[in-house]
């Protein structure tokens, strides 16, 4: 996962209405993975994907954003389990779990031409 995606995902978690126990419904709220997909689509990492009626990303979408299935299931379980300050807010524990996800930094390797 790159830093830009992580930052946009965190920003959206603080402003998006949360959907719990149900599949994503754009009008009432989004689940944690739908917010991730929305952020990734905005950054053109994945094509716009309709999360209506589902709450998990496909293997291809996960690979594109750099997230494992295990991380997705962990975050999805937290989305449904933890209580926030309001019924449609994402809990701080969940936001902090996203904040703690590892970021893949590009390697800056100096290549020396063969002399």
Residue ranges and their predicted role:
Residues 1-29, 37-115:
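Domain-length accessory/inserted modules outside core catalytic folds
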